Amino acid sequence: SVGYERPLLPELDLKIQAGEKWVVTGFNGIGKTTLLKTLIGELPPLQGSVCRFETLRITYFSQTLSWPDPKQSALALFSDCYPRKTLQELRFLLAQCRISHELATRPLDTLSGGEQARVKLCLALQQESNLLILDEPTQHLDEWVKKALKEALQRYSGAILLVCHEADFYANWVEHQLSLRSLVR
């Protein structure tokens, strides 16, 4: 079971196979983010265990917009993360996520919520992984960016575990739904 001091959810048996697309649904405060944090190892399970294959490579997109150095620009952040890429390659990666040169050179803490979310998503989508865990990735995004994200996730060959309140975002491509509401007594 997962939680902080007391269980938020009962014991759960969840197996995510390679390439499967899952969505976790439930009302605010039910434990969706706590479940994700337990799955990635940020929180220990209160009871039971989380088993991961050695080949598992997780990319986690948190709904919180925090940065190691909020005064750093997106371009500097990407340069730190990908030191072998040229400035031109980094600008191209950012441009693919609709992050203009002007936005890419501003301090991260001066960007709007939507702009920061685009930087975080762009960073997450560059990482090599076989499981994407996304906590409310559509929050702060305009419709164009949501559409582009949806298309990118549909093309992603690895497994996805998504927390999202927008059924129209995942309705046509997610294969499995875990409704936490049905688990709570």
Name the predicted role of every residue range.
Residues S1-R185:
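ABC ATP-binding cassette signature C-motif
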